Amino acid sequence: MIKNLLLSGAILSAPALMVNAEPKVYTTDNLAQEIHVSLNGKYVAMGDYEQNLSYIWNIDNPETFQALPGESVAYEVANDGTVVGYIKQPGGVYRPCVLENGEWTLLPCHPAVANTAEANCITPDGKIIAGTQFINDPTSEIKGRYYPCIWKKNDDGRWTLTDYSYIKLPDHQGFLTKCLYVNGDDIIIGGRLYCGIGSEVPALIVNGELKFWNEISTYSEPLIWKGQYGAYDENGKQYFTDDPNDPNIFYYDYATVDGYRDGETGEYFAGEFSTVDAQGNFYGYRTRAFNVKEDGSGDLENGATIYNYGKDEWTDNTGFTNFAIGLGNADIVFANGGSMLVNGEKKKITEELGFTTDRIFTFVRSVSSDGKVLGINTAEIHEGTGEYQYFPAIVVLDEPLVAGIDNVIGADGVTIIVSEGRIDVAGAASVAVYDLNGRKVSSSATAHVASGVYVVKADDVVKKVLVK
C-alpha cells in the first residue's frame, strides 16, 4: 500500500516542539561523517572514514569528545556505551570490531572474507550486531560480493558469527548493511542492494532471507549493426555476418528493473534503507518507474521513503531526496537540507527547534528515542581544495520532542516507552498489557490507558510500569 501521509502515533502539535530554554549545541574541530546517538540519548559515537579516527560523547561529560583507540571508524553505539565499527589493519585490511570497556575486540569473520568487513549496527541492549563482509567469489564479475551478517553475544561475553553468504544475490556488488531492527524473534537488517546494470534499491534481510520489492530481469541480445550481426573470430577480430546462427556472434547482457531498461538512457535506480526507528519505520530513499513501455523506456521518479515493517506500508515523498531518520511515535521526520516534517508539515529544523550552528547545517543523522538528543552533520568548505568537510555536532534540547515520555525500558531487544496515558512497545512480536487485577487491557503495540500501574508482557520480557 502506498500512503501519502505518515501514520500518526503520539502526535505533537507544532507549538509542542518549541522548547522553553535554549538548546545546548556541542561541537568539535574533529572531522566525522558517521554519527549515531544511542536510543537512551546518553552516548554519541562518531567516525571519520577519511582519516580512520573515531570519538565518543557522553551526556554526563558533554564538553568532551573522547578519541577512541587505533585507526578505527565507529558506526553505532548501544545504550551502555558499547561501540561497533571497523579497525584498519596493515595492508589496507578492514576488520569488524566492538569496543567494550575501552578496548576494541575483533569480531570473527567468514574464512573467505577479503580485505573489507565491518560491524555497522548494534541493538540498544548491546546483544546483537549486524555488519557487512566482502567475501571472495570467483563466479562474480568483481570476484566477490558484499554479504550481510550478524554477531550474537554469548553468556560468556564472546561473539558468535552468523553469515548470510548463502543468500542468492544479483550478480553485482552485493548488499550493504545500514541499519538493524529486532522485532521479537525477527532480526531485520536494512540496507542497499546492488542490482541490474548499475542500480541500487532498498532491501531487507529478514531472518537470513532477502526481501526487496523490485522485479529484476536479465536478458541477452546479439550485437546488430546495419542489419548484420557482430561477431569475433578466434583471433579476436571483429566481423559482421548475415547468418543468425554463426557461433561467433557477440551477445551482450542487459537488465530491466520493474520493466525499465536499466541504464539505457544513463538513468539508474537509486535507493536504500539508511536508518530505522524503534517503531520499525525504515527511512531512506528510492526510485520508482512509471509509464513503462514494452521497449523498456519509461519515467523514473526519485524521492524520500519510509517503509513500516509491521504494517508493510510505504510512505513516499518526492519533495525530498532522502529521509534521514524520524520519530515514528510522534510523526516527526528529519529530511535532507535542514528540513523536518511535523505531522506532515514542512519545517526548518533550526527554527523549529531553536538552535543555530557555527558551520553549515546539513542534516540530522541520528536521534534518541525521545528526540531530546540529536546527532547532526555540519560542514565547511576547505580553503585549499574547495570541497566540503563534515563535522559532528550534538544538540541537546531542553525538552524531548516526544511528548510526555516518563520512562524508556530496554531488555532483550524489546523497548517499552511509557508516557502520559500511553504505553508503546517496539521490538516484540506479541504484546499484552495487564492491570494489577490481572485484566488484559491491551494486546497492541500502542496502549492508551488510564493512570496507574500496569504489567507489560512483550514476548519473554515482563515489566511493571507506572503511567501518570
Predicted segments — roles?
Residues M1-A21:
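Sec-dependent, cleavable N-terminal signal peptides
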Residues A21-L401:
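Residue-level hotspots at or immediately adjacent to binding/recognition sites across diverse folds
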Residues A112, H382, S430, A445-V449:
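A short acidic/small-residue loop/turn micro-motif
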Residues A231, V431-V433:
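Extended low-complexity, serine/threonine- and proline-enriched intrinsically disordered segments
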Residues R422, K440-G452:
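Glycine-centered tight-turn motifs at strand-turn-strand junctions
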Residues Y434-R439, Y454:
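Short, glycine-anchored, charge-dense loop/turn motifs used at functional sites
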